[in-house]
Amino acid sequence: MVFSKISQVAHYTPKQVISNDDLSQIMDTSHEWISSRTGIEKRHISTVEMTSDLAIRVAEQLLAGSGYDATALDFIIVATISPDASMPSTAAKVQAAIGATNAFAFDMTAACSGFVFALAMADKLIASGAYQRGLVIGAETLSKIIDWQDRSTAVLFGDGAGGVLLEASEQQHFLAEALHTDGARGQSLTSGQSSLRSPFSQGQEVNSFLQMDGRAIFDFAIRDVSRSITAIIEQSGLAKEELDYLLLHQANRRILDKMAKKIGMPREKFLENMMHYGNTSAASIPILLSESVQNGQLKLDGSQHILLSGFGGGLTWGSLIVKI
């Protein structure tokens, strides 16, 4: 059998940093109000670079670290809800920029679960035996879909990208997965809504900014996502103590606090960096993964078990247990 493994990680964020105090200059808020409710202290905001630019930087780092030429790639998947355009896809732009002429490329739209969904799909591509290696990237410029007059959402989000190089392995590294969608609750978190516009329709004005029912999303994370994580740990056959770290979507520190209690695991095993980046949707988990390798918490030598879990718009949620 053919399996897959994560062999390289990388991340990139725009240079412009916006602190909570900076936000207090343009809206009715304060550092204390934001940090006490979310754990977020600052975020990176793109002033020039588009989502594809961030993803390209990550792709270049992944290739440089691996020593592979871009022509050795078989596929590129970019998870994003803030693409440069509806078409061409962000992944296609990455493919062109790095010269990955042998790779097929497509975008994955699953909001804050996007990276986990994309990684699960990439694992299956390699396990099929038809493909040897590819890039899985989460990239967002959420600053362009935020209503900067809406304090309830503007303080939460940031821009950035992270990703992995996935390649074939003789050993199994992806040990368990659980992917979920509940479209019936989709209106709890929306963005990019558009109306019918043609000579034959009577389109109506819609709000295209990101809109969120914060309480509904909070309750969903604590209830449904915690239950799913508990189930996937049982499915994997691992004891909770055998999990070295949990890397969850970086939405809100209060969510992580409550989920740790609900799942029954030590809070210190839940890695976090939302204080530096805010919520970067599909980019949050790969940025956290890359930083954790960079700072030595994760070894990338096959000796650790980690759980990756994303949750957000759709509603979607999904988890993977990976030997890394």
Swiss-Prot record:
InterPro entries: ACP_syn_III_C, ACP_syn_III_N, FabH, Thiolase-like
Pathway: Lipid metabolism; fatty acid biosynthesis
GO molecular function: 3-oxoacyl-[acyl-carrier-protein] synthase activity; beta-ketoacyl-acyl-carrier-protein synthase III activity
Any one GO CC term of the record: cytoplasm
Active-site residues, Swiss-Prot/TrEMBL: 112, 249, 279
Assigned EC number: 2.3.1.180
Taxonomy, superkingdom: Bacteria
Catalysed conversion reaction: malonyl-[ACP] + acetyl-CoA + H(+) = 3-oxobutanoyl-[ACP] + CO2 + CoA
Family annotation (SUPFAM superfamilies): Thiolase-like (SSF53901)
Primary location recorded for the protein, binned into one broad class: cytoplasm
Signal peptide span: none
Keywords for the protein's UniProt record, in alphabetical order: Acyltransferase, Cytoplasm, Fatty acid biosynthesis, Fatty acid metabolism, Lipid biosynthesis, Lipid metabolism, Multifunctional enzyme, Transferase
Top-level EC class: transferase
Residue segments, region ACP-binding: 250-254
GO BP: fatty acid biosynthetic process
Subcellular location: Cytoplasm
Matching PANTHER family: 3-OXOACYL-[ACYL-CARRIER-PROTEIN] SYNTHASE (PTHR43091), BETA-KETOACYL-[ACYL-CARRIER-PROTEIN] SYNTHASE III, CHLOROPLASTIC (PTHR43091:SF1)
Subunit structure: Homodimer.
Function description: Catalyzes the condensation reaction of fatty acid synthesis by the addition to an acyl acceptor of two carbons from malonyl-ACP. Catalyzes the first condensation reaction which initiates fatty acid synthesis and may therefore play a role in governing the total rate of fatty acid production. Possesses both acetoacetyl-ACP synthase and acetyl transacylase activities. Its substrate specificity determines the biosynthesis of branched-chain and/or straight-chain of fatty acids.
HAMAP family xrefs: FabH
Family under the similarity heading: Belongs to the thiolase-like superfamily. FabH family.
This protein's domain notes: The last Arg residue of the ACP-binding site is essential for the weak association between ACP/AcpP and FabH.
Full protein name: Beta-ketoacyl-[acyl-carrier-protein] synthase III
